[in-house]
């Protein structure tokens, strides 16, 4: 129809998700300012993540907020722990406030 054509490149899976060391360190330091119990010794995981496309363009870090014991995020029995919201919001606010220049 309409004499159009398209070339499609379909690739299965995602690129490897690799955190930039300095961004990971920055995120951990920010977390330690707002909450106790930051685990810097979390073992690497082999997860497919579309965020890896962003990390291929700009340095960054795929960071995780602890949510207690129980099923993980993609499990059908997963239940987000609302008690983690204040710590998570404070963590992100700390990173933003630290990185952005103050105005005024």
Where are these regions (language model features)?
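Metal-dependent amide/peptide-bond hydrolase catalytic core
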Residues: 1-104
